[in-house]
From Swiss-Prot:
<dbReference type="InterPro" id="IPR050596">
    <property type="entry name" value="AspAT/PAT-like"/>
</dbReference>
<dbReference type="Pfam" id="PF00155">
    <property type="entry name" value="Aminotran_1_2"/>
</dbReference>
<feature type="modified residue" description="N6-(pyridoxal phosphate)lysine">
    <location>
        <position position="231"/>
    </location>
</feature>
<dbReference type="GO" id="GO:0005737">
    <property type="term" value="C:cytoplasm"/>
</dbReference>
<dbReference type="GO" id="GO:0030170">
    <property type="term" value="F:pyridoxal phosphate binding"/>
</dbReference>
<keyword id="KW-0808">Transferase</keyword>
<dbReference type="GO" id="GO:0006520">
    <property type="term" value="P:amino acid metabolic process"/>
</dbReference>
<protein>
    <recommendedName>
        <fullName>Probable N-acetyl-LL-diaminopimelate aminotransferase</fullName>
        <ecNumber>2.6.1.-</ecNumber>
    </recommendedName>
</protein>
<dbReference type="InterPro" id="IPR015422">
    <property type="entry name" value="PyrdxlP-dep_Trfase_small"/>
</dbReference>
<dbReference type="GO" id="GO:0009089">
    <property type="term" value="P:lysine biosynthetic process via diaminopimelate"/>
</dbReference>
<keyword id="KW-0032">Aminotransferase</keyword>
<dbReference type="InterPro" id="IPR004838">
    <property type="entry name" value="NHTrfase_class1_PyrdxlP-BS"/>
</dbReference>
<keyword id="KW-0663">Pyridoxal phosphate</keyword>
<comment type="subunit">
    <text>Homodimer.</text>
</comment>
<dbReference type="GO" id="GO:0008483">
    <property type="term" value="F:transaminase activity"/>
</dbReference>
<keyword id="KW-0963">Cytoplasm</keyword>
<dbReference type="InterPro" id="IPR004839">
    <property type="entry name" value="Aminotransferase_I/II_large"/>
</dbReference>
């Protein structure tokens, strides 16, 4: 019966991240630096609110867009955090995680033949949805521009078929962010064009040395903002996302959302209400720890002689391994088998990720030290072997 399936569904592949994770699971004594979620527990006060909701039997369907009380709290929370304002009743939707928000947004705005401009390297979760919509992903090489999708790069990629530009910043896998001036330049370029911006800001509370800016501040009428609590409050399993869009767009996204999931979990929504009401600074402790880890990891990688752009957000770093003359998959497999360290091959993040590996520092300092010690020894041995070959020995 498989041949009767939608060809586009059959053509979708399991993400490179998941494929490599399955290989890692077959090995023992592995230091895994692949994880894409916080290594902190959900704050106690958030868990307590969920327990209270369970005890009070808050287990029914909610409004499709989510509890109004939660949407109102999210409106105030994001107005303080990101300096943009969407109406709680008509422009905010509570979704089953940020991924479902992205899915609902794309299914609403894309038609067959449309083009979606995205930076490469990029998280692999966008492309399959775009393909399922019959649209075309247009991945732009940003490796020579500090991994940033600039206004100039967007302008060069624009065609009459362009329907959307994806701005996933802070970035997974590179950790880079866009400055206020860079966002203003993009907004000036796109303003008045028949082009949406999907701004995925799920890592917005994990920025270092500079504040996070949202393009919605400068291009509100064309922007769909995706956010949530997975990274800011360590709530990946609670599946709570936020979608913000102008009301004439949001009302149609809401229909797609309704027929997909009806509503986000009632218990998770009550936990989210507590998070955005009384957990305004919950991300601070995590951010401080991530910053210490980032500085340590960056310094270690530089000391190894690896070419790397220092991230300004998220909890990933994306060093180049091109000097070793290996594909990112072969390098990662050799590192796994010879040193017991797992990094994600850069090829998992589009063809423009080839020649890089993703390292997550969402783990303890002890784990990072051991993993980087092993990586350093592996790098030294690889270079010695290359030198021996070059010397004709």
């Amino acid at each position: 019966m498989e041949h009767l399936l939608n060809p586009k569904a059959r053509e979708i592949e399991i993400s490179g991240i998941r494929k490599f994770s399955n290989l890692v699971a077959q090995h023992e004594d592995v230091i895994s630096l692949t994880i894409g979620q916080p290594d902190f527990f959900t704050p106690h006060h958030v868990k307590a609110a969920a327990k209270k909701a369970i005890d009070e039997n808050v287990t029914s369907y909610t409004p499709n867009a989510g509890y109004l009380e939660l949407r109102q709290a999210v409106q105030l929370y994001m107005k303080k955090k990101a300096d943009f304002n969407y109406d709680a009743e008509s422009e905010i939707i509570i979704t089953t995680g940020a991924s479902q928000a992205i899915d609902a947004a794309f299914r609403t705005i894309l038609s067959p033949g449309d083009e979606v401009i995205m930076p490469g390297p990029i998280y692999p979760g966008y492309e399959p949805i775009i393909n399922l919509c019959g649209a075309k992903p247009v991945i732009v090489d940003t490796t020579s521009h500090g991994f940033k999708l600039t206004a100039r790069l967007i302008e060069d990629a624009l065609t009459p078929n362009t329907k959307c530009v994806v701005l996933p910043y802070p970035s997974n896998p590179t950790g880079v962010t866009l400055s206020e001036e860079e966002l203003k330049s993009i907004a000036a370029l796109l303003k008045g064009r028949n082009v949406f911006v999907l701004s995925d800001e799920i890592y917005s509370e994990l920025t270092y040395d500079r504040p996070h800016y949202s393009i919605a501040t400068y291009l509100r009428d064309q922007t769909i903002v995706i956010n949530g609590l997975s990274k800011s409050h360590s709530m990946t399993g609670w599946r709570i996302g936020f979608l913000f869009a102008p009301k004439d767009i949001a009302k149609h996204i809401l229909k797609v959302h309704q027929y997909n999931v009806s509503c986000a979990s009632s218990i998770s929504q009550k936990a989210a209400l507590e998070a955005v009401t009384n957990g305004f600074d919950d991300a601070l402790i995590m951010r401080e720890q991530y910053k210490k880890r980032l500085d340590y990891v960056y310094d270690r990688l530089v000391s190894m002689g690896l070419d790397v752009v220092k991230p300004s957000g998220a909890f990933y770093i994306f060093p180049s391994i091109k000097s070793f003359g290996m594909t990112s998959f072969d390098f990662s497999m050799a590192l796994l088998e010879d040193a017991g360290v797992a990094l994600v091959p850069g090829s998992s993040f589009s063809t423009y990720g080839e020649g890089y590996v993703r390292l997550s520092f969402a783990c303890s300092m002890d784990t990072l030290r051991e993993g980087l010690d092993r990586l350093e020894l592996f790098v030294l041995k690889k270079r010695e072997a290359m030198q021996t070959i070059n010397n004709g020995v």
